[in-house]
């Protein structure tokens, strides 16, 4: 057996000089860990980082809108989280109680994460743009014992509570009947949690249906995040910034566990409203960020800027996650800064599963290779394993042995039966691999377009569309057709300076004919102002398909829609 402390010290060493052989050794050590009694804050954050690098900066925070900023060492962040935990306990919270969290990017968000894990509570991070109705749905599915919010979102949570009586805490300002979080002692004993104890629940934003509640344990994210850290490549010496909303699982992956696993410095930048991309990249430059993670939506916006204004002298690592990043975006960033954006793949239900490791040659358009902690298999519709390159199949995870980063399950048993079948966890996504074992994302199972006898993955068509100079964003869906079953339709957001017209649509189609097989070229193009997205930046193609169904029922055509 290896102790938790020795394991993570070895992992920190590995991160400083990663290679494939050492990664395999790390994976073997995971199997030797005794995690029956495990509290990540006690065993890793405090026993390693606070003790051994307590004076090192753990968090640098800035608010773009207000100009506020803060810097906290590992020791200071530990004291802050202990005060939060003492306060929660004073108000009657105990192990297993449910704490909903809806806050902006703020130092207290990190402190609450630490306090909840240390205290053995069940945390439910929630997106800051959720409505009262959406919060009511969540509260009805999993009743809160306490809610924590900021002054901008408190009213939404309060109204959603209705007649529910719970403890309410505010991270900033004052509000009647709400409590402050830092009134108590900075001494707080850890709860003696077990590895199988539930500590985090997420309601997935989802591209289809109602949100699903995903249940994670005291080890699945806290220890499983070594996969994310090793793919992102974050090191002890890094200033690591992850552009993510606090309610997204990727915040837990990349703003919390991954950098704090290795003793790095986390950078948190808060902004309200629409992302000011120029200003945000200016902060990346001014703060001297060395490791930067952002969703594809942001990267696509970044490359529309005048990139000559930026000098990222310290930036060494850039990664993307959420949906596959289009090769054209990777090329533009590489040409300008000599930095390759490395793509990776994971879910709220897991940690990072497939990725372009720092030591791996990047193939633009590929999401990389599977992490050895996950036994990834592609299965056909009959459940048989696909062994030939370029055949599209369901992305699944072999359950024997069960990966440490995999969630416990859904709260919905029907969904569990659909997803856990015959020894595999079905992700709901489809992909193929090439002759070198690199994986390529095709789409959600229901996103794949069936036109005549062909199957078309939306990502490939969207990537081709982005190569046209007028296209800022694109989403591709299948729309009903009596002859071909479905037609390929492209929704396009134009860059500034371009106006919708049939001539431009024809020009884009002509460009597509040089890049795609004829059956993949969109037969319908509609120009729109924006695309519907989840809180994590994923395109909601299901919403676009619903729009198409409604339009066809009514016999309507879009204002800037062109059929060929």
UniProtKB/Swiss-Prot annotation:
ATP binds at residues 204-212, 343-348, 429, 444, 538. This is 4-hydroxybutyrate--CoA ligase 1. One of its GO terms (biological process) is fatty acid biosynthetic process. Its cofactor is Mg(2+); Mn(2+). Substrate binds at residues 348, 455. Belongs to the ATP-dependent AMP-binding enzyme family. It is found in: Membrane. The chain crosses the membrane at residues 105-125. It holds the Pfam family AMP-binding_C. It is a single-pass membrane protein. GO terms for cellular component: membrane. Its EC number is 6.2.1.40, 6.2.1.1, 6.2.1.2, 6.2.1.17. GO terms for molecular function: acetate-CoA ligase activity; ATP binding; fatty-acyl-CoA synthase activity; medium-chain fatty acid-CoA ligase activity; propionate-CoA ligase activity. CoA binds at residues 452-454, 484, 513, 521-523. InterPro entries: AMP-bd_C, AMP-bd_C_sf, AMP-dep_synth/lig_dom, ANL_N_sf, Mitochondrial_ACSM. Its main location: membrane. Keywords: ATP-binding, Fatty acid metabolism, Ligase, Lipid metabolism, Magnesium, Membrane, Nucleotide-binding, Transmembrane, Transmembrane helix. Involved in the 3-hydroxypropionate/4-hydroxybutyrate cycle which incorporates carbon dioxide into cellular carbon. Catalyzes the ligation of coenzyme A (CoA) to 4-hydroxybutyrate (4HB). It can also use butyrate, valerate, propionate, acetate and 3-hydroxybutyrate (3HB) as substrates. It comes from Metallosphaera sedula (strain ATCC 51363 / DSM 5348 / JCM 9185 / NBRC 15509 / TH2). It catalyses: 4-hydroxybutanoate + ATP + CoA = 4-hydroxybutanoyl-CoA + AMP + diphosphate; acetate + ATP + CoA = acetyl-CoA + AMP + diphosphate; propanoate + ATP + CoA = propanoyl-CoA + AMP + diphosphate; a medium-chain fatty acid + ATP + CoA = a medium-chain fatty acyl-CoA + AMP + diphosphate.
